[in-house]
């Protein structure tokens, strides 16, 4: 089988990774763009069923864009996304990759909420539809912060948890035995990782009781570190799908190595687990393909006593959702 030598010069300092990747002999499974359009229309209907209008929002513009892509006419990106002019949008492929990144995240969110509709969802959806068309250009942090919260909530919904979005805590997720109080933070730079983690733990200290609804309560922090790994917050590429996956995982492992002691030190404050995630579009060379990657890495805190080990084991159902995604639009 053909092999190709790849040195990851774009990664942060990291443990050694495999130098060789086998070139695939088959194409990746992909979805027709008409599926994305159908998904967007379904998401629009979901929003409207919760009293959220999509007129003159980015949702409406995504639909306009994919309507043109699907029928095969030359998409008028500049006129559709009038406020998204930037040097990063140089080609049709750039526009497509950025749009796919947005749409695939929205579809992931919808997938969870079709399974379980959390309390307090409507108010979050109002914030979700605001903000810039593309995350790489967004200066409205509220909209993207909420989108990240809903992305994480979707995992718990898909894993069968009862999810509550109506409290001051970003997410409260319940299974039969435990209550997980989850704070979600988007991190803008490497220098902010420890700070954002500390902020989240401080919030948990104010908001999390020892028990909630007769369940033992534990703290959980989710950090979106996409901009730490990729300061441009834009697009990335890989020689093969495995190569692109390893790039993200190595970046996540390096970031985790900077805070694992901090996570352990927060055991006294009830922090059970820290979830690091990268969400980015990727262009694959062999075979030619585009994909949205949601790459995850977890730091588990084994210093908590009592029921903590059982609580960690119960969270593996959520981890499995992120690792086994039967969906051609999203790759872990």
Name the predicted role of every residue range.
Residues 1-141, 145-158, 194-332:
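Charged, structured surface patches that assemble and position nucleic-acid processing machinery
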Residues 163, 187, 227-228:
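Short, solvent-exposed loop/turn segments at secondary-structure junctions
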Residues 156, 171-173, 178-190:
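Conserved catalytic cores of phosphodiester-cleaving nucleases, focusing on short active-site segments
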Residues 168, 183-184, 193, 233-235:
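A short secondary-structure junction signal
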Residues 159-171:
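Short, well-structured beta-strand/strand-turn elements
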């Amino acid at each position: 089988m053909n092999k190709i030598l790849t040195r990851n010069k774009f990664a942060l300092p990291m443990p050694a990774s495999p130098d060789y990747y086998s070139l695939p002999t088959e194409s990746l499974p992909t979805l027709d763009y008409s599926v994305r359009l159908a998904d967007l229309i379904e998401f629009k209907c979901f929003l409207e069923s919760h009293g959220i209008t999509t007129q003159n929002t980015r949702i409406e513009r995504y639909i306009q864009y994919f309507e043109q892509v699907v029928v095969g006419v030359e998409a008028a990106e500049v006129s559709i996304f009038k406020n998204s002019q930037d040097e990063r949008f140089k080609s049709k492929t750039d526009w497509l990759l950025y749009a796919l990144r947005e749409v695939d995240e929205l579809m992931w969110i919808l997938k969870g909420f079709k399974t379980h509709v959390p309390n307090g969802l409507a108010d979050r959806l109002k914030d979700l539809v605001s903000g810039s068309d593309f995350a790489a250009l967004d200066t409205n942090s509220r909209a993207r912060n909420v989108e990240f919260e809903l992305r994480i909530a979707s995992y718990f919904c898909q894993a069968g948890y009862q999810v509550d979005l109506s409290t001051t805590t970003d997410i409260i997720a319940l299974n039969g035995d435990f209550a997980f109080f989850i704070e979600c933070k988007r991190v803008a730079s490497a220098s902010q990782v420890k700070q954002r983690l500390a902020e989240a733990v401080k919030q948990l200290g104010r908001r999390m009781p020892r028990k909630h609804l007769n369940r033992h309560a534990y703290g959980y922090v989710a950090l979106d570190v996409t901009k730490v790994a990729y300061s441009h917050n834009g697009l990335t590429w890989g020689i093969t799908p495995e190569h692109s996956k390893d790039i993200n995982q190595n970046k996540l492992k390096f970031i985790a190595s900077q805070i694992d002691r901090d996570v352990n030190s927060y055991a006294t404050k009830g922090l059970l687990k820290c979830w690091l995630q990268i969400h980015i579009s990727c262009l694959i060379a062999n075979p030619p393909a585009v994909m949205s990657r949601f790459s995850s890495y977890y730091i588990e805190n084994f210093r908590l006593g009592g029921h903590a080990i059982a609580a960690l084991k119960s969270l593996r159902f959520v981890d499995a959702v992120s690792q086994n995604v039967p969906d051609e639009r999203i790759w872990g």
